[in-house]
Amino acid sequence: MFFQTWSDFFNMGGYGFYVWLSYAVSLVAVIALIVQSVKQRKTVLQNVLREKQREERLQQANKGNTL
């Protein structure tokens, strides 16, 4: 094993703060990207459903207006 103790592992030879901070920043960025993607997908699906319902209402309204 490269590190003798768990404390050495977390300290990373004096660079632990920077190593774990970079992991934390990366994790926050990935989680933010996932949350944003899920929200955007939900918004797009709602817009598609709204547009589909609008088109169906227009077709129903125009159904009786044909010659």
Swiss-Prot record:
It is found in: Cell inner membrane. Keywords: Cell inner membrane, Cell membrane, Cytochrome c-type biogenesis, Membrane, Transmembrane, Transmembrane helix, Transport. The chain crosses the membrane at residues 17-35. GO terms for cellular component: plasma membrane. It is a single-pass membrane protein. Belongs to the CcmD/CycX/HelD family. Pfam families: CcmD (PF04995). InterPro entries: Haem_export_protD_CcmD (IPR007078), Heme_exporter_D (IPR052075). It comes from Haemophilus influenzae (strain ATCC 51907 / DSM 11121 / KW20 / Rd). This is Heme exporter protein D. Required for the export of heme to the periplasm for the biogenesis of c-type cytochromes. GO terms for biological process: cytochrome c biosynthetic process; cytochrome complex assembly; heme transport.
